[in-house]
């Protein structure tokens, strides 16, 4: 039986602490493990493939799509508008970047969105609705799962968190769009509750609100712990040591953290978007 060759193009795993990388790794593992009878998956390969599947929008991937004689698929992990509140660039540079994103998406034969609510936003940017398909994000239950109490207490001890504390967890890059300042304000109003934020400045000084958020990060309230960027293989420990996931984000597509927390059997407190 002839296998369909899929060339997965991505550099998402090169930037630590961002959900795009997690989504990419989960999807590659899913196709390799569950659909290996039908698909031959290669990563960033230079040879021709039946399907090119872009997970990030590097210019070299755009060139590959334009030269490709097979089918081009691009994952929509963010919209042009979600750059606002995520990174800060000069207005002219941001305008050009948004146009580039739209051009990249238009070049693909098919676009995959992880949340159907954003189909209309892509159409607003001039993209043909018929080429947009919805496939939700996926998180393996072998990677994220409920742990035993003894293991949870070990993790709390590692991060100097009292074993009897009620722990509210925030996950994501430290940036304006993620609602970090609201997270802090809630923590100030609940001084007897422990708040933990897992994530950091994945894009350094171009992070939106960097100077203000850096000051908060380095001098948080007494009941807030910023634990930095945690390797993905350790994130299951972090979810398990928490009592609830709190995500005050202002703009999201489909955060991997929600699925990861659900697999770890944690309740969710989310902003109504």
Regions found by a protein language model. Give the residues of each.
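Membrane-proximal helix-turn-helix segments that form the acceptor-binding/catalytic region
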Residues: 92-111
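Carbohydrate-associated surface elements
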Residues: 117, 138
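Glycosyltransferase donor-sugar binding loop
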Residues: 139, 194-212, 228
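Conserved donor-binding/catalytic core segment of Leloir-type glycosyltransferases
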Residues: 162-178, 184-190, 196-198
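Nucleotide-activated donor-binding/catalytic signature segment of Leloir-type glycosyltransferases, i.e.
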Residues: 210-230
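Short alpha-helical donor nucleotide-sugar binding micro-motif in glycosyltransferases
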Residues: 229, 237-242
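Aromatic "clamp/platform" in nucleotide-sugar-dependent glycosyltransferases that forms part
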Residues: 250
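Short hydrophobic beta-strand element within catalytic cores of glycosyltransferases
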Residues: 267-270
């Amino acid at each position: 039986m002839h296998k369909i060759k899929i060339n997965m193009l991505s550099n998402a795993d090169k930037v630590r602490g961002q959900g795009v990388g997690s989504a990419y790794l989960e999807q590659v593992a899913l196709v390799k493990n569950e659909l290996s009878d039908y698909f031959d998956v290669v990563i960033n390969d230079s040879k021709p493939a039946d399907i090119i599947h872009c997970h990030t929008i590097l210019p070299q991937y755009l060139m590959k799509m334009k030269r490709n004689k097979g089918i081009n698929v691009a994952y929509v992990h963010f919209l042009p508008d979600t750059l606002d509140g995520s990174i800060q660039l000069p207005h002219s540079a941001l305008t050009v970047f948004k146009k580039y994103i739209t051009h990249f998406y238009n070049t693909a034969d098919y676009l995959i969105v992880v949340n159907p609510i954003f189909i209309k936003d892509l159409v607003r940017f001039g993209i043909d609705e018929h080429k947009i398909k919805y496939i939700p994000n996926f998180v393996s239950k072998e990677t994220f799962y409920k742990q035993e109490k003894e293991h949870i207490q070990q993790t709390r001890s590692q991060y100097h968190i009292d074993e009897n504390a009620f722990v509210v967890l925030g996950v994501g890059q430290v940036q304006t769009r993620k609602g970090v300042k609201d997270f802090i304000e809630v923590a100030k109003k609940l001084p007897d509750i422990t708040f933990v934020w897992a994530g950091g400045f994945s894009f350094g000084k171009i992070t939106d609100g960097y100077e203000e958020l850096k000051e908060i990060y380095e001098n948080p309230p007494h009941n807030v712990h910023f634990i930095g960027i945690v390797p993905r293989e350790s994130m299951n420990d972090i979810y398990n040591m928490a009592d609830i996931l709190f995500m005050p984000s202002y703009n999201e597509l489909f955060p991997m953290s929600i699925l990861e927390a659900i697999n770890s059997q944690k309740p969710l407190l989310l902003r109504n978007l």
